[in-house]
Amino acid sequence: MTTRLFIQDVTLRDGMHAVRHRITPEDVGRIVAALDAAGVDAIEVAHGDGLAGGSLNYGPGSNTDWEWIEAAADNLTHARLTTLLLPGIGTIAHLEQAYRLGVRSVRIATHCTEADVSAQHIATARELGMDVSGFLMMSHMAEAEQLAEQAELMESYGAHCVYVTDSGGRLTMDGVRDRVRAYRRVLDPATEIGIHAHENLSLAVANSVVAVEEGVTRVDASLAGHGAGAGNCPIEPFVAVADLYGWKHSCDLFALQDAADDLVRPLQDRPVRVDRETLTLGYAGVYSSFLRHAEAAARRYGLDTRTILLEVGRRGLVGGQEDLIVDIALDLLADTTA
């Protein structure tokens, strides 16, 4: 492989789900400084559900996006400051404010079959001169050719890169391979392809490796896998594998290991790992950020979290429908008491 990998850290965006969007700007600054020194190419910062995601439905943040982004900007020297925006949650005004604070790259995220709602936000980001990626969430819910059609739409709106985004940690290596190949068949050769993996089936590193073998150049990863559900692709083992394969990148493996163990793991109030609940996310194909919501409902109503998650998967809930988890719990409770 001759192309250098672009490794984007998502500890401070997807990882917000793992700490219920509660982290101090001081901790953000420390983590960003460590990541920057370790050579990652980009660092994504926002509420777990993107700009303006803090709410009763998604979970309020301990601080505003702007406080976190300012703390990140103050500690960056080399890496590209990045954020995430979901149309319908974040607005053009939020995007413009992020740009004023130093954000120069954005991922515009939609459900995997709803790329058309990203057009305005992608176009505005391009007008601002930003690096722009399309982020097709829950990519396992669309077959490869259908997903590629959505990627083609995002490209037509101006995206420099489009991601296969395995939000549920449900894809296997064949699923990743098929989707990346489908993208490559329809996208312009100049348009990059990215992979965003979750660890719910313990396949995040394997899926990311397969993606790179198929031509992906942008890889999402996080310190200690810090992210929703069982976490994202853990950056330390992925970089180790990249070294073993001789792939070009700019990361310092030992520095990443130190940041993961010394800065990130101590912040976790629930271990980010594959366990009975997070494995069920991948098994049922459930949006990874639903984990903490389902666990809260299970505690409240005396149910098994896995039972709730299986029903969430059966009903095909997607990101933004967190409020329906309580409805499902009440339905299950009624069934057990009938």
From Swiss-Prot:
Its EC number is 4.1.3.39. Mn(2+) binds at residues 14, 196, 198. The active site is at 17 (proton acceptor). Pfam families: DmpG_comm, HMGL-like. Substrate binds at residues 13-14, 167, 196, 287. One of its GO terms (biological process) is L-leucine biosynthetic process. It comes from the Bacteria. Keywords: Aromatic hydrocarbons catabolism, Lyase, Manganese, Metal-binding. It is an enzyme of class 4 (lyase). It catalyses: (S)-4-hydroxy-2-oxopentanoate = acetaldehyde + pyruvate. Gene3D superfamilies: 1.10.8.60, Aldolase class I. The record marks 13 as: Transition state stabilizer. GO terms for molecular function: 2-isopropylmalate synthase activity; 4-hydroxy-2-oxovalerate aldolase activity; manganese ion binding. Residues 5-257 form the Pyruvate carboxyltransferase domain. The keyword Aminoacyl-tRNA synthetase does not apply. NCBIfam families: 4OH_2_O_val_ald, PRK08195.1. Belongs to the 4-hydroxy-2-oxovalerate aldolase family. This is 4-hydroxy-2-oxovalerate aldolase 3. It comes from Nocardia farcinica (strain IFM 10152).
